[in-house]
Design a protein with these regions (language model features):
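Short, small-residue-rich loop/turn micro-motifs
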Residues: 51-58, 161-163, 234-236, 318
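Flexible glycine/acidic-rich beta-alpha junction loops that bind and position SAM and/or redox cofactors
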Residues: 202-210, 227-253, 263-303, 310-327
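Canonical Radical SAM [4Fe-4S] cluster-binding loop centered on the CxxxCxxC motif
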Residues: 41-78, 170
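Flexible, acidic/Gly-rich N-terminal and inter-domain linker regions that tether
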Residues: 1-46, 56
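Hydrophobic, secondary-structure "cap" segments at the distal end of domains
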Residues: 303-363
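Conserved non-cysteine loop/helix-boundary elements of the Radical SAM core domain that shape
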Residues: 65-93, 98-262, 272-273
Length: 363
């Protein structure tokens, strides 16, 4: 059969793109599965589970999700769509031991804890996956969720705070998290030994360096809550500039001088790197424990697909397709498209260089 001829995988970009034109959706999927099963053993194997639902849609969000969904859509996704897609890739699940699983979206914790557990139980050898990650929002994460994640030994819980300014939350259609709510959440997660991250977004107000003073107060307050780490993003819809990035780097260096139990694990915070950080829209991770921890999007220049990682991405639909990759083959499920990947070595090499300089070794 044409698609089982593995010489196809050695073709050029042009030939692979030609294949996309005449292969059936079934053949494209089969080609991707064969590539995944026969890819480099050195590549980490990642399972990504997408959640297409949110409690409400933030105005700046570019992720594939919606807030106005019906109960029937919700039930169909968890009772039919996900189980079917997991079964559809049973050949991979039966032959591959995944290194990481990442639940993203959308908001995975919009599903009740028992619904999430039913998904965990559908995934073969789920408990054997060493690195388990999940995204959450503070208003959907429950005690039942936290207990479930502890039960299944999740490595990393990322919680989207984004801003502690009520006016900013209103402006961008986000639910506000009060200081008391944040304190209660942090205390519970710490007391239960759950490794958790808080996300914050810079430049949400005026979109320039005038925002830095108030943003520094937010970071200091969040760090006082003692999360395992926090991730700093710039507002993606604003104009990235060297001036703003240098200002943010200076701010973070100042913050770390007062919170010496934290280090920036994925950046040297060197102003001379600002131009490159603007180009690749850098994220900065301030970490207080388990400095060697990382997952497939941990790089300062986060990108998907990621060189060195084969990613099987489920939870897709025609409305919200997801991207899977194996070595240099990219497969967009939901759209049934194949393409050739060209990785930017600057992203991967910069990440390794930073970790080596900081003495943070990767395996």
């Amino acid at each position: 059969m044409l698609v089982k001829d593995f010489d196809l995988l050695k073709n050029t970009k042009t030939n692979l793109n030609h294949l996309d034109m005449f292969l059936s959706p079934h053949q494209k999927k089969e080609l991707f599965i064969n590539s995944f099963l026969n890819s480099s053993r050195e590549n980490k194997k990642v399972l990504y589970i997408h959640t297409p639902f949110c409690q409400q849609k933030c105005k700046y969000c570019t992720c594939g999700s919606k807030a106005n969904f019906s109960l029937s859509e919700y039930k169909k996704f968890y009772e039919e769509t996900l189980p079917f897609q997991i079964a559809e890739y049973n050949e991979i699940f039966n032959k591959v031991q995944f290194d990481q699983v990442y639940f993203g979206g959308g908001t995975p914790t919009i599903a009740e804890a028992q619904v999430l557990e039913s998904v965990f139980k559908l995934i073969p050898n789920f408990e054997m996956i060493p690195n388990k990650c999940l995204e959450a929002s503070p208003h959907t994460l429950t005690i039942e969720h936290a207990d479930l994640l502890k039960k299944y030994k999740f490595s990393f819980i990322s919680i989207g705070i984004q801003s502690l300014e009520k006016s900013m939350c209103t402006k961008y259609n986000r639910q506000y998290v009060s200081h008391q709510e944040l304190s209660n959440l942090s205390t519970y997660l710490r007391n239960n030994n759950i490794y958790f991250n808080y996300d914050l977004i810079a430049f949400l107000d005026k979109g320039d360096i005038r925002d830095l003073q108030s943003f520094q107060k937010e970071i200091n307050y969040v760090l006082d809550m003692k999360p395992s780490c926090i991730t700093i993003h710039q507002y993606y819809q604003s104009h990235f500039s060297i001036e703003k990035t240098k200002g943010l780097i200076s701010l973070l260096n100042n913050v770390l001088s007062h919170h010496q139990d934290y280090i920036c694990a994925n950046s040297m915070l060197d102003p001379n790197d600002a131009e490159m950080d603007v180009l690749y829209q850098a994220e900065y991770r301030l970490v207080s424990e388990n400095y060697n921890y990382y997952h497939y999007m941990w790089s300062k220049y986060a990108s998907i697909p990621v060189q060195g990682y084969n990613i099987l991405s489920l939870g897709y639909s025609k409305e919200y397709p997801t991207v899977s990759n194996s070595d240099k083959i990219c497969y967009v499920a939901g759209e049934d498209k194949l393409s050739y990947l060209k990785y930017d070595p600057q992203i991967h090499n910069s990440f390794l260089d930073i970790r080596q300089k900081k003495g943070l070794l990767t395996d």
